[in-house]
Amino acid sequence: MATPHINAEMGDFADVVLMPGDPLRAKHIAETFLEDVREVNNVRGMLGFTGTYKGRKISVMGHGMGIPSCSIYTKELITDFGVKKIIRVGSCGAVRMDVKLRDVVIGMGACTDSKVNRIRFKDHDFAAIADFDMVRNAVDAAKALGVDARVGNLFSADLFYSPDGDMFDVMEKYGILGVEMEAAGIYGVAAEFGAKALTICTVSDHIRTHEQTTAAERQTTFNDMIKIALESVLLGDKE
């Protein structure tokens, strides 16, 4: 049944949901990659759709910006609508010089300056990691598509406009591939409620060099990321 944030019924969502931050990007994914699409959510403008990809039922819905927003939607999808796997598809900023614009990053883990996982884990550190099989399937899908994806840790920041520039030096030292705002929260929700999750990001800007992708470049590389996510779902069905 409907929740305060999702006006759908059980069965409206597939067991796998792709989640970009922007609800309009969710609409674009549904219209571009899925067939037999129908809208299943529009509360607060957070659009959600269900359709099929190569005959496989898949849903796509926005999750908004930041851990609090994405945590609400992922929790409700898992506990109220039977969703088993969530794949965040978004953008990130690079801090390492060997990570380039338009690189696709598969987030096997996510550090964070948020306390959300400490709250749920009795004030202890929680290793916020993606599901191994989902990571492996994404890597295999990327190889099959000819995309040289990077695999490693992300950093989920609470502040988009951070006043602590020195923190980027620490991230680089520890090998962080990209900075975004949601992965650690999504991995924590999945762990708490018995689901599986993965984050795949496209590098849209470089924090060190101040380079940014153009709208056309973002669209092309974004499509590569979505194809990886969708094909990884099909690979997961073969397990």
From Swiss-Prot:
Its EC number is 2.4.2.1. Disulfide bonds: none annotated. Gene3D superfamilies: Nucleoside phosphorylase domain. The active site is at residue 205. One of its GO terms (cellular component) is cytosol. GO terms for biological process: purine nucleoside catabolic process. One of its GO terms (molecular function) is purine-nucleoside phosphorylase activity. It comes from the Bacteria. It catalyses: a purine D-ribonucleoside + phosphate = a purine nucleobase + alpha-D-ribose 1-phosphate; a purine 2'-deoxy-D-ribonucleoside + phosphate = a purine nucleobase + 2-deoxy-alpha-D-ribose 1-phosphate. The record marks 218 as: Important for catalytic activity. It is an enzyme of class 2 (transferase). Keywords: Glycosyltransferase, Transferase. A purine D-ribonucleoside binds at residues 5, 180-182, 204-205. InterPro entries: DeoD-type, Nucleoside_phosphorylase_CS, Nucleoside_phosphorylase_d, Nucleoside_phosphorylase_sf. Pfam families: PNP_UDP_1. Phosphate binds at residues 21, 25, 44, 88-91. Belongs to the PNP/UDP phosphorylase family. Homohexamer; trimer of homodimers. Catalyzes the reversible phosphorolytic breakdown of the N-glycosidic bond in the beta-(deoxy)ribonucleoside molecules, with the formation of the corresponding free purine bases and pentose-1-phosphate. This is Purine nucleoside phosphorylase DeoD-type. The lineage of its organism: Bacteria, Pseudomonadati, Pseudomonadota, Gammaproteobacteria, Enterobacterales. The gene is deoD.
